[in-house]
């Protein structure tokens, strides 16, 4: 049947025809296919060549077409008539048998008789008498045999023809026609011819309506098999050229790329046609305009919630390149290269695209501007006709994202079976299915979508988890889940080097969860890992995002600055100054805290920087910082109008800071005191300091010179992991519950503010591990002051910090219904003693923490004295410290806290301060 009438649309389908199918149960068809499958491939050229009878008749050659070969020798040299009167083969002179079958039908004519090759092709080949047309006829007959092999699941015949004949250097012939048929160019031309005809058929079918296309599904499936066959042929041909650089190889690769995209697009079109392009499945969007507006709103929310870029600080309001997951995925789809002139425009897969406007829109607005797709057909065309064919998995994931976006929030009974069928059709695993779903949910700015994503994440997190997942969770104020994602994906350590962006995200997550000691250990260990890698490779080089190159000192600067800025934002400066910073890290800590004090002199950050040096018995540097802070405060007061309360706080801070610094200077020898107070201290060394002195002048914004790495306390480096392992990480099985707090406690903080006030009426208790060192009855930051053993390295004493943002107990109670939290609770063996164990009549003093007021832990809950982060061992022999003795003579006074409140403040009124003109903006000010 040449034409078909489909649902009354005879004119639309008239140009599309289905070839008459042979009767595969008949013996001639079976014999022909068996002969084709078992033939010696070197004889395939001889079978395809047009032969004429070589017998002489009346002193001339017979010249008739030869349809048979001689049985003894297999030469096609005699026609049927001449075979009856000749006794020998004209070619090899072998004797013909006198009895039995002398002739056997040639393979080509055997296929014609069986109906595998149309007789019109056979007649056309015999009508060509001229030499140039005769060569074309021979090639056409070989193509016909290839077509028979392709249409009958014998494409391996063509593949073996390439490897065993075309690529065999011994396969040669003196016959120019046979020599031409032995060349691989013939096979490549056959692939182009077949692909061209397939494109024409597909284009006609794709232009039909949905109902019409459904009637041609059988034809589409047959085309899919053909395209898959010629694609496998090109793979074999490409492997034969492997290792060589030639135009032929480039031509084959380009052709294979086009055929691969056609196959992928054809498969997705078959699925869409089967489901009627989901015309019967209602979308949750009323129209395309509303959908497009919602995607724009998602993009706007992503920009608003994006964190500042810790790497690129070129602008005041520098933020990370905020983007949605769908935008990143579309950007990764590479555009196809320019086609060579040899292939021709008739081989471009763009012919199959129905609507050219969507492609032009993506060219104008960028790749990400093509989303959302107007309909299912546009989605199939945009994804599978463009971009590399090797990105088929990513394209399928984007298609799933589109389906989830189109139908989520509607009843699952209407669309879930469609998603499941898509996954089953294309072999998509449940993990990949849920991953696409999570990407959509994290792009959706609704709280419902975020909760659903948090419920699914435990099932799909692993080593291959996209690093941006943790970043987006952090941006959406869910650092606890982000931390779990890092742990589940194996990125909570530094076993492997990561990009600088991933490292910053991991640091931010830990700080936001209150894990300051873990964040500090992470940045320290990572920088050492980068330095070791630089030395091992013999070059200060590490490839990160977009192939940027960073030295280990630049890694340290970025991570330490980020750590300090986050601590300032969360009012945790009083905790980070107690960490064991090495001299290289101190340089960036000093700069960051001093910049913060310059931007906001009314805060306690500058005073805490003085405390940082006093705790390390580096009195001269504390004196220098105090002098600089006094100048900054004087300039701030003179240039701005500030409230009385802010003025009182600043004066109190300055008074007590100066008094403590003066007392510290009094400890120095008299000669040094005179030199310091006379300003002759620039070339002096602090005799009580064993560590390297950090530079006090302003350093440039980006330190590019290589800073020598100072040897740090090896005990800390060796025991960092053990100390972290000893820290309780869960309460009732949750990884978010902190361990016992040791050192200065913090308070509940308001999220999103750079500097916030503490809870009204709440006093912070600052305690030492052993309470061996006391400065009178007043509360001062020097309660934890201790002298390091033999050097100025501060040995930290904190075992675990907890998030001041989230009440963990309340978080667990509200979220224990989630299945992944229940699983963690069941599997986590770590438990923490409940605070209810403390009796009401206990003599223990309540400890103020950012989780509320609780009793101080029992003695058996204290940190082991051998812990390198424990400060108590260094305090045992310092009860008679001069500073402590002098401090006991004072009563009352201002107590510096990171929340910027004094003990006497019952109610606080916020006073806005005018910005200082001409002052350089710091990166943390943009937070």
UniProtKB/Swiss-Prot annotation:
Primary location: nucleus
Any single Gene Ontology cellular-component annotation: nucleus
Name of the gene: HOS1
Protein name, as recorded: E3 ubiquitin-protein ligase HOS1
Tissue expression: Ubiquitously expressed with higher levels in leaf vasculature, roots and root tips.
Disruption phenotype: Early flowering, and insensitivity to ambient temperature and to intermittent cold, but normal responses to vernalization and gibberellic acid.
Role according to the record: E3 ubiquitin-protein ligase that mediates ubiquitination and subsequent proteasomal degradation of the transcription factor ICE1. Acts as a negative regulator of cold signaling pathways. Probably involved in recruiting the NUP107-160 subcomplex of the nuclear pore complex to chromatin. Controls flowering time in response to ambient temperatures (16 and 23 degrees Celsius) and intermittent cold, probably via the regulation of FT and TSF levels.
Pfam name, any one: ELYS
Polar residues bias spans: 832-851, 878-892
Species this chain originates from: Arabidopsis thaliana (Mouse-ear cress)
């Amino acid at each position: 049947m040449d034409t078909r009438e489909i649902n009354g649309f005879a004119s639309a389908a008239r140009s599309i025809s289905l070839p008459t199918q042979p009767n595969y149960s008949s013996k001639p068809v079976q014999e022909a296919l068996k002969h084709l499958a078992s033939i010696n491939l070197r004889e395939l050229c001889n079978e395809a060549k047009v032969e004429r009878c070589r017998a002489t008749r009346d002193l001339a050659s017979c010249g008739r077409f030869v349809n048979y070969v001689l049985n003894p020798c297999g030469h096609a040299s005699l026609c049927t008539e001449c075979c009856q009167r000749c006794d020998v083969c004209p070619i090899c002179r072998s004797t013909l048998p006198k009895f039995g079958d002398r002739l056997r039908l040639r393979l080509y004519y055997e296929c014609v008789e069986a109906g595998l090759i149309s007789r019109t092709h056979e007649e056309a080949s015999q009508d060509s008498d001229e030499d140039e047309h005769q060569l074309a006829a021979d090639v056409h007959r070989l193509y016909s045999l290839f077509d028979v092999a392709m249409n009958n699941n014998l494409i391996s015949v063509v593949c073996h023809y390439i490897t065993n004949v075309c690529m065999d250097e011994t396969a040669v012939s003196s016959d120019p026609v046979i020599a031409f048929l032995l060349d691989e160019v013939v096979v490549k031309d056959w692939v182009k011819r077949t692909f061209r005809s397939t494109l024409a058929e597909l284009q006609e079918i794709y232009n039909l309506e949905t109902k019409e296309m459904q009637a041609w599904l059988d034809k589409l499936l047959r085309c899919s098999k053909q395209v898959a066959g010629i694609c496998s042929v090109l793979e074999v041909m490409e492997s034969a050229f492997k290792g060589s650089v030639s135009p032929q190889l480039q031509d084959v690769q380009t052709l294979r790329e086009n055929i691969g995209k056609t196959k992928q697009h054809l498969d997705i079109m078959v699925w869409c046609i089967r489901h009627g392009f989901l015309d019967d499945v209602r979308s949750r969007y009323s129209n395309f305009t509303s959908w497009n507006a919602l995607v724009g709103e998602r993009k706007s929310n992503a920009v608003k919630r994006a964190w500042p870029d810790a790497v690129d600080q070129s602008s005041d309001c520098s933020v990370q390149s905020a983007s949605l997951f769908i935008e990143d995925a579309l950007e990764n789809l590479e555009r196809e290269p320019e086609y060579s002139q040899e292939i021709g425009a008739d081989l471009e897969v763009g012919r199959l695209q129905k609507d050219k406007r969507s492609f032009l829109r993506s060219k104008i607005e960028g790749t990400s501007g093509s989303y959302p797709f107007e309909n299912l057909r546009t989605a199939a065309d945009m994804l599978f006709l463009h971009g590399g064919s090797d990105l088929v998995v990513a394209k399928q994931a984007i298609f799933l994202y589109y389906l989830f976006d189109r139908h989520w929030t509607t009843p699952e009974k209407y669309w879930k079976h469609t998603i499941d069928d898509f996954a089953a059709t294309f072999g998509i695993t449940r993990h990949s299915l849920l991953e696409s779903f999570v990407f959509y949910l994290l792009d959706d700015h609704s709280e419902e979508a975020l909760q659903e994503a948090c419920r699914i994440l435990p099932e799909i997190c692993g080593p291959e988890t996209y690093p941006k997942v943790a970043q987006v969770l952090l941006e959406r104020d869910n650092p606890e889940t982000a931390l779990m994602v890092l742990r589940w994906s194996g990125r909570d350590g530094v076993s492997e080097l990561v990009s600088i962006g991933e490292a910053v995200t991991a640091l931010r997550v830990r700080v936001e969860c209150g894990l300051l000691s873990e964040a500090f250990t992470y940045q320290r260990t990572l920088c050492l890992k980068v330095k070791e890698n630089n030395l091992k490779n013999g070059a200060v080089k590490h490839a990160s995002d977009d192939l940027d190159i960073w030295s280990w000192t630049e890694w340290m600067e970025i991570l330490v600055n980020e750590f300090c800025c986050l601590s300032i934002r969360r009012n945790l400066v009083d905790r980070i100054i107690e960490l064991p910073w090495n001299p290289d890290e101190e340089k960036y800590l000093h700069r960051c805290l001093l910049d913060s004090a310059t931007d906001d002199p009314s805060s306690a950050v500058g005073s805490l920087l003085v405390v940082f040096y006093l705790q390390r018995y580096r009195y001269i540097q504390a004196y220098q910082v105090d002098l600089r802070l006094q100048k900054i405060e004087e300039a701030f007061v003179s240039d701005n109008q500030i409230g009385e309360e802010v003025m009182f706080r600043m004066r109190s801070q300055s008074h007590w800071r100066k008094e403590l610094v003066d007392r510290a200077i009094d400890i120095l020898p008299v000669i040094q005191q005179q030199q310091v107070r006379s300003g002759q201290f620039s070339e002096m060394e602090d005799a009580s300091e064993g560590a390297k002195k950090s530079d006090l002048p302003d350093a440039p914004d980006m330190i590019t010179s290589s800073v020598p790495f100072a040897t740090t306390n090896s005990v800390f480096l060796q025991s960092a992991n053990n100390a972290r392992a000893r820290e309780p990480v869960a309460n009732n099985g949750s990884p978010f519950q902190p361990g016992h707090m040791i050192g200065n406690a913090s308070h509940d903080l308001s999220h999103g503010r750079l500097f916030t006030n503490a809870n009204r009426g709440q006093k912070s208790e600052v305690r030492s591990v052993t309470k061996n060192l006391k400065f009178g009855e007043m509360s001062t930051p020097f309660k934890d002051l201790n002298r390091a053993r033999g050097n100025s390295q501060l040995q930290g004493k904190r075992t675990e910090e907890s998030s001041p943002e989230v009440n963990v107990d309340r978080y667990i109670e509200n979220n224990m219904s989630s299945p992944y939290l229940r699983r963690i609770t069941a599997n986590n063996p770590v438990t923490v003693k409940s605070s209810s164990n403390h009796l009401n009549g206990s003599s223990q003093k309540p400890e103020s923490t950012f989780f509320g007021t609780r009793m101080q832990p029992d003695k058996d809950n204290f940190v082991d004295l051998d812990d390198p982060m424990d400060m108590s061992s260094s305090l045992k022999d310092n009860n008679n410290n001069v500073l402590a003795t002098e401090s006991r003579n004072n009563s009352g006074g201002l107590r510096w806290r990171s929340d910027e409140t004094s003990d006497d403040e019952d109610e606080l009124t916020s006073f806005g301060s005018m910005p200082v003109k001409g002052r350089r903006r710091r990166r943390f000010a943009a937070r």
